[in-house]
């Protein structure tokens, strides 16, 4: 079995009396596409935010790439990529400029920067639009650019929070074609949240979450 790259034990997040995440235990293995499936308000985004160090757990332990998310959040952030649920690109910049800014923030060496940007634009089939302002992109193109940006600093793990939310079925399928190619070429582990049942079929394993608790874990076939 591949090594564990994400581990949570008794993970809890409370907001006053509201328990958004209620004692989650999970393990994700290297190279997996792991899906977090559940309705809105189930605790998916709260969990992913704790694993990405954007929220501090109320209780429990979480390790990402072997690193405690509370004790060394900066080291965790260097090893992960994150594609947010809401758009976070600068529409006034070009595709290349958005990636250049991200590469600078993550201290990607200047000698590597141009090569990596070209590689990711090519992998996401955006090379011909590298010099176009992002405001001219379709929703699917913007999502592909966000994925390219999330992979630019070569993370071990890519977190995707509702990666195809608001996209039409054909565009959603295209995004998953690109994600599978990315996993195949880069060996990245993908942890994604979704409330689309059909999207869970793309995952190696799924955890179903409801009211802040994991109610089932298994392959798509096992959970049918």
Map each language-model feature to its residues.
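Conserved ABC ATPase "signature" region
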Residues: 100, 104, 111-129
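Conserved catalytic motifs of ABC-family nucleotide-binding domains
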Residues: 154
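Catalytic Walker B motif of ABC-type/P-loop ATPase nucleotide-binding domains
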Residues: 158-161
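Helical segment within the ABC ATPase nucleotide-binding domain
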Residues: 173-186
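ABC ATPase "signature
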Residues: 217-218
């Amino acid at each position: 079995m591949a090594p564990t790259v994400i581990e949570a034990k008794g993970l809890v997040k409370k907001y006053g009396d509201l328990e958004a995440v209620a004692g989650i235990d999970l393990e994700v293995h290297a190279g997996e596409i792991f899906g977090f499936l559940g309705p809105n308000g189930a605790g998916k985004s709260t969990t992913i935010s704790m694993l990405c160090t954007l929220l501090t757990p109320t209780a429990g332990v979480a390790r990402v790439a072997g690193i405690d998310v509370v004790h060394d959040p900066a080291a965790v952030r260097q090893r992960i990529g994150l594609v947010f649920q809401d758009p976070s690109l600068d529409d006034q910049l070009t595709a290349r400029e958005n990636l250049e800014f991200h590469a600078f923030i993550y201290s990607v060496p200047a000698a590597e920067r141009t090569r990596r940007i070209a590689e990711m634009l090519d992998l996401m089939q955006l090379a011909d639009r590298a010099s176009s302002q992002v405001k001219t992109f379709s929703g699917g193109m913007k999502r592909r650019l966000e994925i390219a940006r999330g992979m630019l600093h070569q993370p071990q793990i890519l977190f995707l929070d509702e990666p195809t939310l608001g996209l039409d079925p054909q565009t959603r399928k295209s995004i998953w074609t690109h994600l599978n190619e990315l996993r195949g070429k880069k060996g990245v582990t993908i942890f994604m949240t979704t409330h689309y049942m059909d999207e869970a079929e793309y995952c190696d394993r799924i955890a179903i979450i409801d009211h802040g608790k994991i109610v089932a874990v298994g392959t798509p076939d096992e959970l049918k």
